[in-house]
Each structure stands twice: as C-alpha cells, then as structure tokens.
C-alpha cells in the first residue's frame, strides 16, 4: 500500500491559512472517519519519483490511463497520474475498498464524482496547480476546493486595460 500525503482535519467553520507543501508522500496512520462537521483537506506534491508514478499508474482505470496518454507533454501525463492515483488511494481509505475498486462517473465538463454505489458515503473535490494538488473530503455535504499558483505578471496592467472597466482598473490601483 502506498503511503499518503499530508492531511489536515478542518472543522467547517475554520480555514487553513498556511499549508506546508510536502515534497514527498509520507504519512503515519490516520483516522479516515469523517464526522458530519468535518472537512479533511489533503495536500501533496505532483512531483513524485518514478517508482511512485508507476505504483499509481497500476491502480488507474483503463479510461484514466487513456486520458493520461492523451496529454502531449510527459510532465502533464505524470501530473494527471499522480493527482488521480492519490485521489483513488484516499477514496479507497474513506470507502474501505481497494483504490482500483473506486468507480467514477463524470459530469459533462469532465469532473469526476463517485459512482452511485459510493456517492452517499463521501463527497470530494480536488484542485491542482503547478506542482501542488489539494483534495477535500466531507461526509455531510458537497465540497469544493481551489488552489492557484501565484506567479508574477509583468503585463498585468495591459491585461486589465483589455478586460476591465475604467472603474475596475481604478480600484485595482
């Protein structure tokens, strides 16, 4: 069994302000019990050693492997495999099944959701950007999470001039 990324158990009324980004997937034993008022937030690096990528590839469905292969760049293929593989490992723990047994259905825009068989047990969401992936899990409600890599933008004023009103530009300054 693969070791897992870092986890925070977050009460719904609290926010995680600063998260350390692990560069390896490590974890000691964890409680995968979600109370009605908990949200679990997991964080992992998409940069994983080849041996981990190989292990995660083995638990993906054939559809997921095909989707990964459609990415033109190898680093995007690896990122998809790592993000989806870790999702399967985490869901396997929450659902008490093997990661390869997790079944997804897909919304029209391609977002994965648990198949009907497991959908009532846990709700999840994931977001990835640059080298980081975040996962959120809840047992009592639909959940979302978002992460965005912050990068310098030298042409920010030019972008604003083309996309925002004069009032919006003034508020940005």
Please tell me what each predicted stretch does.
Residues 2-173:
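Core catalytic alpha/beta fold that binds nucleotide/phospho-ligands
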């Amino acid at each position: 069994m693969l070791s897992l990324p870092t986890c925070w158990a977050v009460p719904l009324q609290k926010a995680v302000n600063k998260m350390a980004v692990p560069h390896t997937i490590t974890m000691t034993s964890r409680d995968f019990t979600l109370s009605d008022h908990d949200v679990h937030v997991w964080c992992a690096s998409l940069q994983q050693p080849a041996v981990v990528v190989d292990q995660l590839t083995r638990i993906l469905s054939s559809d997921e492997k095909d989707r990964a292969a459609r990415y033109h760049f190898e680093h995007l293929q690896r990122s998809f495999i790592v993000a989806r593989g870790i999702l399967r490992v985490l869901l396997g723990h929450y659902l008490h099944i093997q990661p390869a047994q997790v079944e997804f259905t897909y919304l029209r825009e391609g977002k994965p959701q648990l198949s009907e068989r497991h959908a009532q047990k846990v709700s999840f969401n994931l977001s990835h950007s640059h080298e980081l992936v975040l996962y959120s899990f809840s047992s009592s409600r639909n959940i979302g999470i978002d992460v965005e890599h912050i990068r310098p933008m030298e042409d920010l004023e030019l972008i604003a001039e083309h996309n925002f009103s004069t009032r919006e530009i003034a508020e940005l300054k």
